[in-house]
């Protein structure tokens, strides 16, 4: 094993990378509230794992969605646990994200030179809320259906472009299969892809600039 490691070390300088990760300076004023972003990331990773597991059983059609969720909850081994963890971690992720935003704002972490870190963080916050809105509808029960109807109906109050926006969100004039398909695509593909782009940017900027000092 030693010879194998030495070959990789010679070419990739693994030890230097490890030293850089483990020896980063942490300011003395840092406390538990500075862990909220990391907790949000942990919740997101739990979401990815449990969400991926549920895609094996979920059927994104208006006739089968609810039944597939019921099957997952009652027939699949530990299916109830997987879905419950997904729901609990989703709620925890939103809560931790909100607290993280407040902590950064109250401690001035958005100020120069960390403006871009703040911008990517706000984008990630919007993506987090979007995950919640789209995921809430996927069981296609009464709560999910009416939540979608209300959320997608909000833009209708906008002059001129309101109605086209509603049709764009729903896929048609009314809520139906097109709406569920769009929300499922957003929840399982588009939003995760955008998160996979902005999250590394966010963490790399934090890594480069370090944690902001006390007020």
UniProtKB/Swiss-Prot annotation:
Q: Where in the cell is it found?
A: Plastid, Chloroplast thylakoid membrane
User: Where exactly are the transmembrane stretches of this chain?
Assistant: 32-52, 90-110, 116-136, 186-206
The protein depicted here goes by the name: Cytochrome b6
Sites binding heme c sit at 35
Biological processes, Gene Ontology terms: photosynthesis; respiratory electron transport chain
Q: How is the cofactor bound?
A: Binds 2 heme b groups non-covalently with two histidine residues as axial ligands.
Please indicate if the UniProt record lists RNA-binding as a keyword: no
Q: Is Metal-binding set as a keyword in this record?
A: yes
Required cofactors, per record? heme b; heme c
One Pfam family here: Cytochrome_B
* Protein keywords: Chloroplast, Electron transport, Heme, Iron, Membrane, Metal-binding, Photosynthesis, Plastid, Thylakoid, Transmembrane, Transmembrane helix, Transport
The record ties this protein, via SUPFAM superfamilies, to: Transmembrane di-heme cytochromes
In the record, the note on similarity to other proteins reads: Belongs to the cytochrome b family. PetB subfamily.
Bilayer topology reads: Multi-pass membrane protein
Q: Which residues form a coiled coil?
A: none
Please explain the role this protein plays, according to its UniProt record. Answer: Component of the cytochrome b6-f complex, which mediates electron transfer between photosystem II (PSII) and photosystem I (PSI), cyclic electron flow around PSI, and state transitions.
């Amino acid at each position: 094993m030693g010879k194998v490691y030495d070959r990789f070390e010679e070419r990739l300088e693994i030890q230097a990378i490890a030293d850089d990760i483990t020896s980063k300076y942490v300011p003395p004023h840092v406390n538990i509230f500075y862990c909220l972003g990391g907790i949000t990331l942990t919740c997101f990773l739990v979401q990815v794992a449990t969400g991926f597991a549920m895609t094996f059983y979920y059927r994104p059609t208006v006739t089968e969605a609810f039944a597939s969720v019921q099957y997952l909850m009652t027939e699949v081994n530990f299916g109830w646990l997987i879905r419950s963890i997904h729901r609990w971690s989703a709620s925890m992720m939103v809560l931790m994200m909100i607290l993280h935003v407040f902590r950064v704002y109250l401690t001035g972490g958005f100020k120069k030179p960390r403006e871009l870190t703040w911008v990517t963080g706000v984008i990630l916050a919007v993506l987090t809320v979007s995950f919640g809105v789209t995921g809430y509808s996927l069981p296609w029960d009464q709560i999910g259906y009416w939540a979608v109807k209300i959320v997608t109906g909000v833009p209708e109050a906008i002059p001129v472009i309101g109605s086209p926006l509603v049709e764009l969100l729903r896929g048609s004039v009314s809520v139906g299969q097109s709406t569920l398909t769009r929300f499922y695509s957003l929840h399982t593909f588009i939003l995760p892809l955008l998160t996979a782009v902005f999250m590394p940017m966010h963490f790399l900027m934090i890594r480069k600039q370090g944690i902001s000092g006390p007020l």
